[in-house]
Amino acid sequence: MRIILGIYSILFVICSISVAQTENEHASLMSLVQTERAFARTSVAKGIRESFLAFFADDGIVFRPHPVRYKETVANTPPPTNPLAVTLNWEPLFADVARSGDLGYTTGPYTLTDNSPEKRQPQHGFFFSVWKKQADGNWRVVLDAGIRTPELYSGPTKFQLAPRLVKESAESRLEPGEGKEMLLNAECELMEVAATDGFVKAFVAHISKDARVYRQGVQPVIGIDSVRAFLSKRPFTQSWKPMKAEVARSADLGYTYGSYEKKERGAAAAMEKGYYARVWKRDATGRWHVVFDVANPLPSNESE
């Protein structure tokens, strides 16, 4: 009887810890989404510049078109005379956060509206932001990118939470520093397989079943079958060089960004150059999967 009671006590403790971790993770995710929405409200009320300065980390990166630190870039730039001449508004539709609650990302549709006398047509697209919890406990953007789409998004508007891929276990825990090394190894493995098997085959083999791929001029491509079909439309090869990788304390979520070069199959010259950003997520077996990928091509005059 004592043995049975002991087993039940252990199971109760394990279940309690699991529930507490799930609740903490959900709370972190909701706080991230609330911060994203506050960011958007500030943008509409006070303008793009002021909102970005308020919600970006000091080392937060944007692509203009090369990666730069936003706060450093605008530090010596005079503020606009009318900060609301153009308004940027957005709404998160999808978000995920690491189990440790210190790193996450959000994405959703945006609209850029011209309020000047010219009243140019609104621009539409999808934003993507990586957030990191700072020492003061606040979420701040560490990387921001996006795509422009030809028309307003008309798909599902219900907010979605990312599916959980990692279960807390002794086998899935990593020592500090191991997560980043493993993530970079996964990125290198993807590059090696792409060099032999082709980018599309390699990429599809390394993504999650519900992965999201963002490319300029088209609506988001979601799901492994849709991604395979989209990338297979035109034969090409792709190479890339990671510039940075960062992983959550729990080592279940991380991101990379860097430069890429895209060529038509058999061609010597690149048909497109630019920068990519990629979110990776680790499953219960310890394997990393790409869950999000966005490309920011350089203007044609810079790609030559």
Which residues does each predicted region cover?
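Bacterial N-terminal signal peptides
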Residues: G6-S16
